[in-house]
């Protein structure tokens, strides 16, 4: 800019000696090309003083300079002062207005239309028709088409091209765009490009490719834009056809050196190969490219990312930065940040953030800020996400959606509501993505009332009815189901009618399962014509929770028979079945599948550990525990629970010590499990120390289960009076579990005097529980109070209380044998009873030492 202004200043000094108007023409054009308004104004004054303004070419050049510098007030003022208004003059003003003054351009065009002379030319329509697209004004576009026909310009190449492009952008392909294309007398490469792009943009890929094939039969040769238009069309086809067609086009390009060396064409070819998954061919072509621009690098980085080649994408970005020929732009950053998230590389993401902060042009780009928010949200770093959000100078609805989504499932509920309040004050219209974040928040806080509010807003805003794919409807259904309102979820399901998808069915099915409505779930399953792994995994869970282990295993086998690969959720639903059957053989099969399938989810490891312990194999449980360095609180709790069930209190204390060294803070569930382990192992002092630490170390209030464990520990030392005092002095009302614990201790230590008092408290706390009555009956029996036993038995009979029958499992050679108390249905019952009787007689025989 500086040298040009110096030149203009020197030119003005020399102009007094007389200068040809053609020199003025060249200098004014130079000012227009770089939008140098200051120099242009100076030249305008000079031209005016010397009388060169009377020259038509010079005046048009000055007019064009004002239009290019977007000084439309000066441009129109000069226009009104001009004596000769030919089509070129009108078109200059129309071009300037079309950049930023859409409606004003249309008014100016109408003024030209009603003027006696001149009439709009083909260039005029080439300027105004694209403006109709930008304004979304198809009515005026069609009106102009009528005017074009009356003016006899419909066969003109420039006008025809503009009409084809306009109709294609409005989606009016048949008959409008195609008729306009067919009417062009001399079709040039732009004509063919317009119709191919029009078909492609309207997802009419077969027609687009057919048009390209017809073009090849014409004298007009495809150019770089044609190749760029047709390659995405090929990529959208069936993979085998796509590869064959794309390679044929590549061969066509190689035979024409002017296309082969064009960087735009090379970028399009690389993009095509990446879209069809031919990564090696894309990489080879990229390496051979003579010249690469930033688009070349961006195409390959984004292509690697879309093909899940995260490391290759990151390595290429690293090469781009260190090569230094071109600098990353916003497109590069938007592509690479999700790659860092996939690689769980927070450090590299932060380095990229630092790079952004050092380059203000990136910091000002809203899309870059949006990508940063999403990146930090993937790591659960809401503070960093909010910081990136607060630094953004301009925020759009995508920015707000990204930050709301970051906070939606975090514990920071107040911040989410505060952000939502600010969004509503910004007067930005919420879209369906915003609603999805709101529903995620509602699920997080289990707020059924809030789900109804969001539902009401969605209906009023018309967001539900505008959906072709019921993404929002499915999300509402899922939110109602997860918040426990299956009735409303079913209403949403019915409302979706023919728009129901597999997601709709699975969401309702999951709602039924979570609410325990297994019959409704099974009925819905029978109605489903399409199923996926999620569906079948839910069916495994239904049978597992319904105590139908054989059916659950049958469903699991059906999953494999259908060629589906069970995932983490499937196995987690199946493992409780192994515990129900107490089948170590089945657990080991599941463990083998987990290893072969590479299922390393920490929650799955915790469940596997727990089931091994429940099946009696502490060795396998501890092996699973030791195998994962990511041990979390759930795994520690499961390991302690396993030791607790088997009375291995010392080992449980060792795990507790290990957890403390790992700086993992225990929760109520873990402490209760530790207390249970101490109770079962008789570790009274250790247990009481852990109980005291609930308040003194961890700053928590004991739960009812923990109070019951403390009572058990005190009573196990024979200090029943102390235990009774502890219960009566509790800051909360003791429940039946606590009184029942104390009653069992009274029975064990033969303290019937205290036991009668405790029994009365127990019945007052829970009078209709079968187990409580059996417990009291056992106490009477231990004290030989048979009248009390009979009285309680009669009372239980009157209340129709039944003690559940005892049940045992025994696995022999992978075959499960079930024995229920009083059951004689086993096929080998005779030999079993004979052996039991023989063992009983041996036990009765006197032992001789």
Curated annotation (Swiss-Prot):
Question: Could you list the residue ranges forming a coiled coil in this record?
Answer: none
Region (Type E motif) location:
738-813
| Superkingdom of origin | Eukaryota
Task: Give the Gene3D superfamilies listed for this entry.
Answer: Tetratricopeptide repeat domain
- PPR repeat ranges? 20-54, 55-89, 121-155, 156-187, 188-222, 223-260, 262-296, 297-327, 329-363, 365-399, 400-430, 431-465, 469-499, 501-531, 532-566, 567-597, 601-631, 632-666, 667-702, 703-733
Q: What are the alphabetically sorted keywords of the record?
A: Repeat
Work out whether the entry's keyword set contains Repeat: yes
Q: Which GO terms describe its biological process?
A: mitochondrial mRNA modification; response to abscisic acid; response to water deprivation
Q: Which residues form the signal peptide?
A: none
- Keyword DNA damage assigned to the entry: answer is no
The molecular function terms of the Gene Ontology recorded here are: RNA binding
Query: Where are the residues of the annotated region Type E(+) motif?
Result: 814-844
Write out the GO cellular component annotations. mitochondrion
State the Pfam families in the record: E_motif, PPR, PPR_2
**NCBIfam families xrefs:** PPR (TIGR00756)
* Similarity-based family: Belongs to the PPR family. PCMP-E subfamily.
Q: What is this protein called?
A: Putative pentatricopeptide repeat-containing protein At5g08490
């Amino acid at each position: 800019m500086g040298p040009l202004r110096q030149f203009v200043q020197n030119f003005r000094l020399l102009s007094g000696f007389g200068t040809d108007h053609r020199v003025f023409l060249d200098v004014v054009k130079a000012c227009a090309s770089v939008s140098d308004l200051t120099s242009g104004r100076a030249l305008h004054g000079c031209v005016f003083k010397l009388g060169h303004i009377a020259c038509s070419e010079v005046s048009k050049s000055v007019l064009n300079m004002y239009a290019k510098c977007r000084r439309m007030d000066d441009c129109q003022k000069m226009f009104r002062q001009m004596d000769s208004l030919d089509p070129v003059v009108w078109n200059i003003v129309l071009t300037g207005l079309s950049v930023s003054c859409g409606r004003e351009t249309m008014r100016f065009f109408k003024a030209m239309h009603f003027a006696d002379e001149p009439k709009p030319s083909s260039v005029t329509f080439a300027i105004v028709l694209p403006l109709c697209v930008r304004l979304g004004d198809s009515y005026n576009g069609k009106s102009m088409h009528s005017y074009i026909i009356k003016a006899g310009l419909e066969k003109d190449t420039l006008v025809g091209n503009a009409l084809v492009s306009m109709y294609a952008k409005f989606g009016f392909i048949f008959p409008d765009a195609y008729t306009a294309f067919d009417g062009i007398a001399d079709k040039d490469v732009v004509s063919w490009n317009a119709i191919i792009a029009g078909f492609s943009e309207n997802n009419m890929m077969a027609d687009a490719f057919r048009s390209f094939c017809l073009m090849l039969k014409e004298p007009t040769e495809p150019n770089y834009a044609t190749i760029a238009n047709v390659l995405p069309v090929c990529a959208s086809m069936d993979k085998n056809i796509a590869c064959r067609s794309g390679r044929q086009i590549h061969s066509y390009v190689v035979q024409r050196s002017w296309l082969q060396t064009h960087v735009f064409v090379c970028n399009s070819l690389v993009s095509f190969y990446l879209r069809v998954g031919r990564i090696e061919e894309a990489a080879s072509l990229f390496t051979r490219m003579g010249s690469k621009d930033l688009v070349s690098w961006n195409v390959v980085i984004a292509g690697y990312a879309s093909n899940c080649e995260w490391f290759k994408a990151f390595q290429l970005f690293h090469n781009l930065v260190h090569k230094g020929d071109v600098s990353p732009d916003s497109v590069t950053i938007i592509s690479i940040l999700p790659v860092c998230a996939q690689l769980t590389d927070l450090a590299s993401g932060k380095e990229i953030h630092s790079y952004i902060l050092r380059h203000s042009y990136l910091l000002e780009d809203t899309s870059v800020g949006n990508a940063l928010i999403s990146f930090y949200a993937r790591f659960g770093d809401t503070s960093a996400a909010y910081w990136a959000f607060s630094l953004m100078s301009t925020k759009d609805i995508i920015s707000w959606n990204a930050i709301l989504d970051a906070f939606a499932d975090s514990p920071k509920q107040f911040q989410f509501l505060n952000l939502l309040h600010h969004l509503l004050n910004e007067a930005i219209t919420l879209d369906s993505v915003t609603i999805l974040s709101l529903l995620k928040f509602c699920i997080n806080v289990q707020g059924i009332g809030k789900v109804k509010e969001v539902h009401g807003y969605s209906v009023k805003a018309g967001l539900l009815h505008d959906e072709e794919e019921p993404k929002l409807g499915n999300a509402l259904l899922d939110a109602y189901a997860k918040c426990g309102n299956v009735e409303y979820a079913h209403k949403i399901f019915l409302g979706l009618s023919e728009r129901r998808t597999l997601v709709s069915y699975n969401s309702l099915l999951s709602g039924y399962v979570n609410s325990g409505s297994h019959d409704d779930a099974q009925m819905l399953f029978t109605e489903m014509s399409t199923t996926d792994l999620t569906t079948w995994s839910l069916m495994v869970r239904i049978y597992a929770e319904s105590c139908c282990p054989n059916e659950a295993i049958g469903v699991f086998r059906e999953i494999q028979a259908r060629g589906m690969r069970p995932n983490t959720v499937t196995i987690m639903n199946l493992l409780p079945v192994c515990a129900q059957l107490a089948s170590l053989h089945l657990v080991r099969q599941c463990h083998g599948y987990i290893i072969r399938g590479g299922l390393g989810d920490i929650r799955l490891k915790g469940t596997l550990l727990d089931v091994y312990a429940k099946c009696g194999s502490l060795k396998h449980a501890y092996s699973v525990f030791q195998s994962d360095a990511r041990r979390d609180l759930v795994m520690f709790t499961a390991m302690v629970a396993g030791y607790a069930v088997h009375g291995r209190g010392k080992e449980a204390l060792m795990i507790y010590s290990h957890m403390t060294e790992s700086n993992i803070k225990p929760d109520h569930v873990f402490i209760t499990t530790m207390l249970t382990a101490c109770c079962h192992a008789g570790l009274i002092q250790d247990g009481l120390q852990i109980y005291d630490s609930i308040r003194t170390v961890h700053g928590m209030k004991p739960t009812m289960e923990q109070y019951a464990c403390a009572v058990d520990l005190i009573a196990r030392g024979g200090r029943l009076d102390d235990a009774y005092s502890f219960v009566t002095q509790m800051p909360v009302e003791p429940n039946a579990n606590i009184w029942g614990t104390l009653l069992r201790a009274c029975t064990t230590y033969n303290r019937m005097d205290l036991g009668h008092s405790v029994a009365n408290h127990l019945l007052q706390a829970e009078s209709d529980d079968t187990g409580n009555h059996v417990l009291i009956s056992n106490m009477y029996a231990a004290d030989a109070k048979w009248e009390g036993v009979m009285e309680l038995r009669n009372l239980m009979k009157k209340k129709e209380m039944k003690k559940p029958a005892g049940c045992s499992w025994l696995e022999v050679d992978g075959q499960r044998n079930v024995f229920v108390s009083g059951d004689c249905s086993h096929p080998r019952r005779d030999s079993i009873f004979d052996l039991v009787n023989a063992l009983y007689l041996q036990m009765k025989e006197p032992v001789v030492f």
